[in-house]
């Protein structure tokens, strides 16, 4: 798209800010809170339209608020306090997100992913599974799922995991059986494999806290609004029954609902064997990487009472550098990690300001009036369903989470009977699972959709079917299991 045709992307956020700012301040809100909300909404619009990278949008929003903090961030009472220096306070607020433990946890997880890539361990694991399970098409589907499952805990970019590691491997498989893209032969085996690729990415994105950046953004938003949080182990245990069910069910379900013509063959295992021979035996760097990953996972699951999850990640990254699994240049040159680091920290800062100015509490009280008379369970389920279905309107999981999660959290806070940890975990699971609904919902979606093996009608049909199944199972496990382990 030419720059001359993109002007509206730049003007739209500014127009939204101006329109909201000109609306009379609602009853119960102070003027600075309403103006803050106007800028916050403009940032969300900017994240959706992306006239510039999302991190830049968020940083610009923070800069505007910090510079104009006497009118946007602080109340007249705060400004009148003796010794109150808005310049120092606004700077402290602007950089507060970078001290959040969630930021450092996801940054460490990105470095784990770099270690997987640099050592070749991630590719080796996927090839081993394909070799062992690739004789039958159904088992090949499970191999794709298990590959995603193993990589997901330490690969917080589902795009890097799905599009960068898994897709380059499985795209080589269909041609081995003369299953070609954009051809009648695509249904032979290619369509099933590609659908398994994207659906496995969505499922595993919901299973682990560190499997997808928006999961950690949600926890940051939750913490800034309520001071409650979910640990890595909380998320894992809360999702455990649903995780087991989906990992075992989805490959078979795809096999039944989108059956491949070819049921078995030996070409895929032979190809995987050739690739593994070319890689050679497991090297010392891969062994060290494997040991560190296992250690990190054990501490994340069982060590929460002794060491913070972010500190585990930070320490393991230090060991990765010391053991020369990755280099310092790998860290400073990791654009994806630094990009997420800045936009996630900035969005958490903005969400903190939304709470500090009183908007979240005001919005919660507003919702409390409209939700009174309904049971907490009914309200919780209705909110999850609405949140899930609104996924159709967003082409970015980050924008989706940034725009809707604060409102969902405010709604839950409006009814003390709603267990916030359970509700937020259901929201978090919906972010990943709901990504299956459309061919534009998350980073890997367009990659698999554009492979030539998934026709448009098939993608939308399967997305709706699997999306509905995921939603039903999420609600059931959310109501029956999550309260047992989280409350």
UniProtKB/Swiss-Prot annotation:
Domain of life: Bacteria
InterPro entries: CitT-rel (IPR030676), SLC13A/DASS (IPR001898)
Keyword Iron: no
Entry keywords, A to Z: Antiport, Cell inner membrane, Cell membrane, Membrane, Transmembrane, Transmembrane helix, Transport
Membrane topology of the entry: Multi-pass membrane protein
Pfam families per record: Na_sulph_symp (PF00939)
NCBIfam families named in the record: dass
Family affiliation: Belongs to the SLC13A/DASS transporter (TC 2.A.47) family. DIT1 subfamily.
Role of this protein: Catalyzes the uptake of tartrate in exchange for intracellular succinate. Essential for anaerobic L-tartrate fermentation.
Protein's name in the database: L-tartrate/succinate antiporter
Upper taxonomic lineage: Bacteria, Pseudomonadati, Pseudomonadota, Gammaproteobacteria, Enterobacterales
């Amino acid at each position: 798209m030419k720059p001359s045709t993109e002007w509206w992307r730049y003007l739209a956020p500014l127009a939204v800010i101006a329109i909201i700012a000109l609306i009379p301040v609602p009853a119960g809100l102070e003027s600075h809170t309403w103006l803050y909300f106007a800028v916050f909404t403009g940032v969300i619009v900017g994240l959706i339209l992306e006239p510039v990278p999302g991190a830049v949008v968020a940083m610009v929003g923070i800069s505007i608020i910090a510079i104009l903090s006497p009118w946007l961030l602080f109340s007249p009472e705060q400004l009148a306090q003796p010794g109150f220096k808005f310049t120092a306070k606004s700077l402290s607020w602007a950089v507060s997100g970078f001290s959040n433990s969630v930021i450092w946890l996801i940054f460490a997880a990105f470095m784990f992913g770099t270690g997987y890539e640099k050592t070749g361990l991630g590719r080796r694991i996927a090839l081993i599974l394909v070799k062992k399970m690739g004789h039958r098409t159904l088992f090949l589907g499970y191999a794709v799922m298990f590959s995603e499952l193993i990589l997901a805990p330490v690969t917080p970019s589902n795009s890097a995991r799905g599009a960068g590691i898994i897709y380059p491997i499985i795209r080589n498989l269909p041609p081995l059986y003369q299953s070609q893209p954009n051809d009648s032969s695509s249904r032979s085996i290619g369509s099933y494999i590609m659908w398994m690729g994207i659906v496995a990415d969505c499922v595993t994105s919901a299973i682990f806290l560190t499997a997808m950046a928006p999961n950690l953004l949600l926890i940051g938003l939750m913490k800034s609004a309520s001071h409650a949080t979910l640990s890595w182990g909380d998320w894992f245990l809360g999702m455990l029954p649903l995780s087991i069910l989906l990992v075992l069910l989805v490959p078979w379900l795809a096999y039944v609902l989108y059956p491949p013509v070819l049921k078995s063959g030996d070409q895929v295992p032979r190809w995987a064997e050739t690739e593994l021979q070319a890689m050679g035996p497991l090297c010392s760097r891969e062994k060290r990487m494997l040991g560190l990953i296992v250690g990190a996972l054990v501490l994340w699951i069982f060590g929460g009472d002794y060491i913070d999850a972010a500190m585990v990640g930070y320490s393991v990254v230090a060991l990765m550098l010391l053991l020369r699994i990755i280099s310092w240049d790998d860290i400073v040159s990791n654009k994806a990690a630094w990009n997420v680091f800045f936009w996630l920290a900035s969005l958490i800062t903005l969400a903190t300001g939304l709470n500090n100015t009183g908007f979240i509490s005001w919005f919660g009280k507003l919702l409390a009036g409209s939700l009174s008379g309904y049971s907490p369970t009914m309200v919780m389920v209705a909110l999850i369903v609405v949140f899930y279905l609104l996924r159709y309107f967003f082409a970015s999981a980050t924008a989706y989470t940034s725009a809707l999660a604060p409102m969902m959290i405010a709604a839950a806070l409006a009814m003390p009977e709603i267990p916030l940890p359970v509700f937020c975990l259901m929201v978090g699971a919906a972010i990943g699972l709901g990504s299956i609904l459309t061919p534009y919902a998350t980073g890997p979606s367009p990659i698999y959709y554009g492979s030539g093996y998934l026709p448009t009608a098939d993608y939308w049909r399967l997305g709706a079917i699997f999306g509905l199944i995921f939603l039903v199972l999420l609600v059931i496990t959310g109501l029956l299991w999550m309260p047992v382990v989280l409350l």
